[in-house]
Amino acid sequence: MAGKTLYDKLWDSHLVKQRDDGSALIYIDRHIIHEVTSPQAFEGLRLAKRKPWRIDSIIATPDHNVPTTAERKGGIGAIEDQVSRLQVQTLDDNCDEYGITEFKMNDPRQGIVHVIGPEQGATLPGMSVVCGDSHTSTHGAFGALAHGIGTSEVEHVLATQCLVAKKMKNMLVSVEGQLPFGVTAKDIVLAVIGKIGTAGGNGYAIEFAGSAIRDLSIEGRMTICNMSIEAGARVGMVATDEKTVEYVKGRPFAPKGAEWDLAVEAWKDLVSDPDAVFDTVVRLDAAQIKPQVSWGTSPEMVLAVDQNVPDPAQEPDLVKRGSIERALKYMGLKANQPITDIQLDRVFIGSCTNSRIEDLRAAADVAKGRKVASTIKQAIVVPGSGLIKAQAEKEGLDKVFIEAGFEWREPGCSMCLAMNPDRLGSGEHCASTSNRNFEGRQGAGGRTHLVSPAMAAAAAVNGRFIDVRDLIQH
């Protein structure tokens, strides 16, 4: 009998009941909630006269709708948009009513759900983790079974601590070799999506492995797993190792004392067996990956910074040709235009993909001693949590950004999505460290280019895309 993959082990350890229709009942260890997908779920509980089943499994924070400017210090009443204000207030009210742990808008621990979960040690190896947000795959970086759920499923988990799900197939994405200087986790995952496409992972749980993945920090692994969903996979994960254990140790929600020792011993098994069989295997050579830039309206429309935008006339597949033509029109680009000729209007460094302290350090290394180009209308840096903001300020990163001409903001989802005051104007091009470049994602008519934090900072000071390796020393 073949060995088990990491996903197989996590699935089996959370399986409550296998059902005749092929679906299964899965137990949920950690439930993270925010203000957008939870109000309807709580209302459903009330109508059914139920209460949350396991209060201690839930943590909450507002992130999607919160302002990132100083006005938020005035509290929820300072949120201008009526719907946003109501959603944040409703989250507070629901958490207060049921005694749920919430890091409220002006709590120093507040931040983006997929940043604060790991930061607090609420995400642990071997756990099943869900949130009403598609980028919950981020937490898979800890050897956890993590994925997004819909609002009705949020209610189911609140009420029963279980979820109806179907087991996925196994995909291994192996990235071997050493990353070149200046190439990051963000470049790896964009290259993976460019290779397999946004539907490549449909129906799969992806395990990212190989020497290049093992060499990444935990924050880098979170970036990779975060964008599993952009590759079509609801679940992305990395096996647990010494780096995972060291990252979790001592965090507020992490086990303590004898429980810690038992946990660490159990976590040693959170790897795929040597003889495990994967349904699909994808291989990349890390040495061949260059800094990536998305050019179109899908994350799979991505190229190395030294390449040219594609020419639809050279695409024999009629469907793909049509997609390229539509993307070029929306993005205001010309066939064969060099990536480095794309003029930018705004730069956004933040989101659940790239707003952690290592991301901010990488961007600050590029910005230090330089100025944002005069052609850039706005460049903003939004830390992923209040604790990250405080750490960055302790290191003086805020001063580096401010002196260079960036705006230094409060934590939140910000310009990743047009659900708060931070958004693009129609026709504006933005170098963004976020995860999605769909039409209108950052604002109606906005044009998004996905890049790493270092590449975003380089674009800010250059006014156009440039290979960041031309600006920094090895």
From Swiss-Prot:
Pfam families cross-referenced by the UniProt entry: Aconitase (PF00330)
Classification lineage: Bacteria, Pseudomonadati, Pseudomonadota, Gammaproteobacteria, Pseudomonadales
Full protein name: 3-isopropylmalate dehydratase large subunit
Binding residues annotated for [4Fe-4S] cluster, in chain numbering: C352, C413, C416
Organism: Pseudomonas syringae pv. syringae (strain B728a)
Function per UniProt: Catalyzes the isomerization between 2-isopropylmalate and 3-isopropylmalate, via the formation of 2-isopropylmaleate.
Record has 4Fe-4S as a keyword: yes
GO BP annotations listed: L-leucine biosynthetic process
Cofactor note: Binds 1 [4Fe-4S] cluster per subunit.
Subunit structure: Heterodimer of LeuC and LeuD.
GO molecular function, one term: 4 iron, 4 sulfur cluster binding
SUPFAM superfamilies, per database record: Aconitase iron-sulfur domain
